[in-house]
A protein has these predicted regions:
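C-terminal catalytic/acceptor-binding lobe
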Residues: 2, 137-138, 142-178
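Conserved donor NDP-sugar-binding/catalytic core segment of glycosyltransferases
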Residues: 66-98
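Aromatic-glycine-rich donor-binding/catalytic loop that engages nucleotide-sugar donors
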Residues: 112, 116, 120-138, 142, ...
Length: 178
């Protein structure tokens, strides 16, 4: 496990992720697709991927989303500090519709990130709280509560670059297969 390496895990089913192009992995960044299937529970798939990942810091991302350069630099610094840490990304302020506004309010009031915000954490913290927990319609709900039981989150990082409007397919797939 490399202290500076960051593992980016893109969440979604095999069908949702099959045409997705990811940046090439390097000595500083590792990119992995979850490719959820009906053969294995989501929680076990994520636990196995995180266990086998090479990075000290893990970032769970929605399909077709990546952190911007500023966020990557901050994540690299967090990874190098080697302290238990977790947090999420801000909402993109450019897209402003009613539903997005409700999600922003919900996220700030509950202090639990939504799927389109992504979440990051250290591998050590993840396994100290027993893994992801129940992976339901709000995938980061359970794990956020577990992390809160240990430490407070970092301030949200700059918004993810989302290259699709099609995040609902991922959520519908999860709901349909729970």
């Amino acid at each position: 496990m490399s202290q500076e390496l960051i593992t980016y895990i893109v969440l979604g089913s095999h069908e949702r992720l099959k045409g997705l192009k990811l940046p090439a992995s390097s000595n500083k960044e590792e990119y992995v697709l979850t490719n959820f299937s009906n053969d294995e529970p989501f929680e076990k798939t994520i636990d196995n991927i995180i266990f086998n990942s090479k990075g000290n810091l893990v970032v769970l991302l929605p399909p077709s989303a990546l952190p911007n350069q500023k966020s990557k630099e901050i994540l690299r610094k967090i990874s190098m500090i080697d302290q238990s840490s977790w947090g999420w990304f801000k909402y993109n302020d450019r897209k402003n519709d009613f539903i997005k506004s409700l999600k922003k309010i919900s996220s700030s009031v509950r202090s639990i990130p939504n799927i389109e915000q992504g979440i990051y954490f250290t591998k050590r913290l993840y396994f100290s709280v027993g893994g992801i927990g129940k992976f339901g319609t709000s995938p980061f709900n359970e794990i956020s509560k577990r992390f809160y039981s240990r430490i407070d989150p970092q301030n949200p990082l700059p918004a993810l670059i989302i290259r699709t409007k099609n995040l609902d397919i991922f959520q519908k797939w999860i709901i349909k297969h729970l």
